[in-house]
Amino acid sequence: MKSVLSTATRNFRFRSMAFLAVFFAVVAGSVTAGAQVTALPPYSFSVFATSKKPHYYQPDSIAVWNNRVFIGYGNNAKPDGTSGSSTIVEYAMDGSVIQTFTVKGHNDGLKVDPKTNLLWVLQNEDANPNLVIIDPRNRRSKKYTFSKPAHGGGYDDMAFEGDQVYISASNPANNPNTQQAIVKATLNGNHVDVTPILLGDSNAIDVTTGQQVQLNLQDPDSMRFDAAGDLVLDSQADAELIVLHHPGAVNQTVYRVPLSTNNTAVQIDDTVFPEVSQGVILVSDRDGETVYAVTAPLFGPDPFSAAPTSLDQLNMSTGVLTPVVSGMVSPHGMYFIPTP
């Protein structure tokens, strides 16, 4: 597998050189959270942002663009879109609030299109999904709709690579799931057209055994490209990561990484893949109403995942998770910001 950095990461790093020192100075000087959250040396943490009830609360997805951090707050909106709205908060690197955006429904997916620098905001992971694309520079936005999902649920997360955008098909209606688990998305007027690239019952190679297995993806959730260019999907309730090499191509290959701690299956949410050894991991503790900044002298080469109450280091060869920051309530969204 090739080892390359995405265009978005390279561009972000070049833009970051002047201000990341300020970010780390603020993070290092901020007040740490209560004693219930602890870090295993050499890791340390501090508070980057907190909820501001009743205006915005339940922080989840995190995106970074042009020296800014965007965090989606769910505000207890219904994940099927039947009631409520979410707030997207734009922060400076020192944690100060710049502006906020309101979207109807429950926001779960939040990514920046590296080609247009527009913010893609995806709502309603259980049913009735919609997409809002926002230009943070002028606050212009446009809403897009989906046809009724073939798998019967909603859409959860997005991942960009080149000209392609992929979306995870969440909350499937059937067990076994024979419908789409990952789709390729195309904007068409005010509509999002989707084409399946992975079905819920596809075959895969289990990385821990080398044997072929048939998947039954019951909870497609968070999704991200790793540093090698592979698309990595978290099937949360199934306690496994699904790795797609050459996603959407005729030579696409699929791998399964079963997740565990002490031989017990573990469900995770987001996963980040530090492509350089120095940086900071932002992680949102949704029900703890806090976004933490986690630092270490060196990161890597392993990724890090949001486990039920901790931030864990993940061995992709074995699927074993090892806590490095513990005592959170419910970690969800994550983002790795590299140092220049």
Which stretches of residues belong to each language-model region?
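N-terminal secretory signal peptides that target proteins for export/translocation
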Residues: 1-14
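Bacterial N-terminal signal peptides
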Residues: 17-29
